[in-house]
Amino acid sequence: MNQRANQRVAYYNGNIVAERDVRIPFRDRSFLYGDGCFDMTRTFNGTVFKLTEHVERLFESLAYLRIDINLSPSEVVEISNEVLSRNRHLLDAGDDYWLGQRISRGVKAVGDEGWDDTGPTVIVVCEPLTFQERAHYYRDGLKVIIPSVRRTPPEMLSPRTKTHNYLNLVMADL
């Protein structure tokens, strides 16, 4: 594992913890059903881009999914800035981060197996932008196709909601 990756921290359900220590229970509804949403922004020269607007969009997704995370948008902005601040020293000059918030409905207990309802899972992370890995697309171009299977129609699920269901994009990469 990259030494810097080993040092990154994330916000996880109320605490700033080592990123490597974040664990999602297998009964988390996002893992089971894709029942969650996210938003991402990035930094430019270390400065986060339109964080408030991205968090507002996150809260629109949360409202659509009827998930209450018991945090205000301003608190999520503050948490996001804290995560970025604690990870900024790990970047080389000229490098930047993705800064993202990932929310799920959390664990929903079923039956008597000993699991408790957890409430929402809230994670805020920084991930290095990997321009070097994508540079060849800009230099050489890439082939594209129009798939025969389309995304979920907007009558079924609002395309304005950034949900955890990106399986169609995963399939396109295979």
Short names for language-model regions:
Residues 1-174:
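Conserved alpha/beta cores of soluble small-molecule-handling proteins
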